[in-house]
């Protein structure tokens, strides 16, 4: 089976925060799981280097947009690598390859009659002497009356036009923009109304889109899909490939989602592989992002794919809700965030991955609390999983000289492990990552109980053969926990693999066990509560 996984493209205008990772981490879990199953996986993403936020930041700092994009693209790559993300292709939207691919898609849509020209009114700043792209205009949402940008309201998820806003202001200088006529290209989104409606009806039956994606898309369909501008007067971006319009740029909402397609084509060129299997109707596709990106993946991207004749419209939409920080809405402008480069300096990446999975905002907003982070690490990773692994391996090191004793697999444990692979696999495929990880840790707690009830420290004196059986079965459980937890906790899984010399990485019960162990080290270190108190003080002290 061909599995395509697309992770949303973060804007390269500032550091990643935990909210980004909370929405993107499911993509890596899926990719690792499906590879272990032996499926053909293509997992792509990249940095959005063409967005208006980058141009705004560059202007504020007196540098070029490329300077900003280069800085954060490189930082993103380091962060994703440090967190264990296994992208097959992580690229950027200001690359020549991306520009060519997007222009080809634009021309195909134009040739098929899905794009047309239209004279429209647009916000114009007399002070800055320029037309204002959507994100250069800020004001009040006409629907919910919250602060909003000219392209979308984060509060109510309404897709907006800058002229819809109340109390409009130029983001660059703060003046009230005027309205002038200009010519732009438009995407005939209304012509895909019935196809999008059918797609939503289908996923309601299969349950393969998150509820928030279904509900929001149903709302758009009910209101009637509106044609959207596909060009803008932007300072940076992909030029319109039509004579006389080269100064205009392809609008980011269609250009950025086409990044999945361009990254796929880039991967194919780089590897010599054929990527077409990931774009036909038989492919299993997952799009992983936050709820603010829903309309771009549930309406616009499917319409683009239908418009260019590709069959692989999103089968799974994994649209997480928001992550708050210490019960407050995350705010980058106020520096109310936990920044990824910062947290990676001091904490195990598996601790971050574990917390953001068991506390994932899958169906509702969830909160990152430093105290809860401490608890999840010390109680679950260290106290449950690390404890079981270390007590078993230390016992072997101390009493068997590092040689794993002979034994036979307990039938009850064997059935439990085989059932766990099936249950966890199904949960991952259904994008229920929290359920999957909690099921494994239920088994970890069972394993600790098994060790305690068998009391191998007594068996060693009273019944050495039973002791060997107990320890053998504990190693059996560890070997399988390593495989089951690989998609979630790749770093600790790798450490145990090295200790036990486990080679098999397939998603299947491990019945062949290692014969010896090498240099047992603690799987996790305890986090001191004083360190967490310092983190909380630092967070509150950094607020602008």
UniProtKB/Swiss-Prot annotation:
A GO molecular function term, named singly, is: methionine-tRNA ligase activity
The free-text note explaining how the cofactor binds reads: Binds 1 zinc ion per subunit.
InterPro entries for this protein: aa-tRNA-synth_I_CS, Anticodon_Met, M/V/L/I-tRNA-synth_anticd-bd, Met-tRNA_ligase_1, Met-tRNA_synth, Methionyl/Leucyl_tRNA_Synth, MetRS_core, MetRS_Zn
Q: Which CDD domains match?
A: Anticodon_Ia_Met, MetRS_core
Gene3D superfamilies cross-referenced by the UniProt entry: HUPs, Isoleucyl-tRNA Synthetase, Domain 1, Methionyl-tRNA synthetase, Zn-domain
UniProt catalytic activity: tRNA(Met) + L-methionine + ATP = L-methionyl-tRNA(Met) + AMP + diphosphate
Report the protein name in the record. Answer: Methionine--tRNA ligase
Q: Which organism is it from?
A: Bacillus cereus (strain AH187)
Instruction: Name the Pfam families on file.
Output: Anticodon_1 (PF08264), tRNA-synt_1g (PF09334)
UniProt key word Zinc: yes
Specify which residues bind ATP according to the UniProt entry for this protein: 332
Q: Which PANTHER family match?
A: METHIONINE--TRNA LIGASE, METHIONINE--TRNA LIGASE, CYTOPLASMIC
Q: Where is it found, in Gene Ontology cellular component terms?
A: cytosol
Q: Give the enzyme's main class according to its UniProt record, as a single word.
A: ligase
């Amino acid at each position: 089976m061909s599995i395509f996984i697309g992770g949303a493209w973060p804007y390269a205008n500032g550091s990643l925060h935990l909210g980004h990772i909370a929405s993107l981490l499911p993509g890596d879990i899926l990719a690792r799981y499906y590879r272990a199953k032996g499926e053909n996986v293509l997992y792509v993403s990249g940095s959005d280097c063409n967005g208006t936020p980058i141009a705004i930041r560059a202007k504020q700092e007196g540098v070029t947009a490329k300077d900003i994009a280069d800085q954060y693209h490189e930082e993103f790559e380091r962060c994703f690598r440090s967190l264990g993300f296994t992208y097959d292709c992580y690229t950027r939207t200001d690359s020549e390859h991306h520009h060519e691919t997007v222009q080809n898609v634009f021309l195909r849509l134009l040739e098929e009659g899905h794009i047309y020209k239209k004279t429209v009114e647009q916000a114009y700043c007399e002070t800055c002497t320029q037309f204002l792209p959507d994100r250069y205009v800020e004001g009040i949402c006409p629907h919910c009356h919250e602060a909003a940008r000219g392209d979308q309201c984060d509060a109510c998820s309404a897709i907006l036009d800058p002229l819809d806003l109340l109390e409009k202001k130029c983001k660059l200088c703060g003046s009230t923009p005027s309205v002038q006529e200009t010519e732009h290209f438009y995407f005939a989104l209304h012509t895909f109304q019935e196809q999008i409606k059918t797609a939503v009806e289908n996923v309601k039956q299969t349950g393969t889109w998150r509820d928030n994606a279904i509900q929001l898309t149903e709302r758009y369909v009910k209101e009637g899909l509106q044609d959207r501008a596909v060009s803008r007067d932007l300072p940076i971006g992909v030029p319109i490939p039509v004579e006389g319009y080269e100064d205009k740029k392809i609008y980011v909402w269609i250009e950025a989602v086409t990044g999945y397609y361009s990254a796929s084509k880039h991967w194919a060129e780089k590897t010599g592989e054929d990527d077409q299997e990931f774009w036909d109707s038989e492919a299993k596709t997952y799009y992983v992002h936050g709820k603010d990106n829903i309309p771009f993946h549930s309406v616009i991207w499917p319409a683009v794919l239908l418009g260019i004749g590709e069959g692989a419209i999103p089968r799974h939409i994994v649209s997480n809700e928001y992550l708050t920080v210490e019960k407050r809405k995350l705010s980058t402008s106020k520096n109310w965030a936990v920044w990824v480069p910062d947290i990676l300096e001091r904490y195990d990446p598996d601790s971050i991955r574990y917390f953001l999975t068991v506390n994932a905002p899958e169906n509702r907003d969830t909160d990152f609390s430093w105290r809860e982070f401490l608890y999840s690490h010390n109680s679950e990773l260290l106290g449950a999983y690390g404890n079981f692994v270390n007590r078993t391996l230390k016992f072997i090191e101390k009493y068997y000289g590092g040689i794993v004793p002979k034994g036979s697999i307990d039938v009850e444990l064997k059935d439990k492990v085989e059932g766990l692979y099936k249950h966890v696999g199904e949960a991952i495929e259904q994008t229920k990552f929290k359920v999957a990880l909690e099921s494994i840790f239920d088994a970890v707690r069972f394993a600790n109980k098994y060790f305690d009830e068998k009391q191998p420290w007594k068996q060693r004196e009273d019944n050495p053969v039973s002791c060997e059986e107990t320890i053998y079965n504990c190693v059996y459980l560890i070997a399988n926990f390593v495989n089951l937890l690989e998609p979630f906790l790749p770093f600790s899984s790798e450490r145990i693999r090295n200790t036990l010399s486990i080679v098999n990485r397939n998603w299947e019960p491990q019945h062949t066990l290692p014969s010896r162990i090498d240099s047992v080290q603690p799987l996790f270190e305890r986090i001191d509560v004083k360190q967490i108190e310092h983190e909380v003080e630092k967070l509150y002290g950094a607020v602008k």
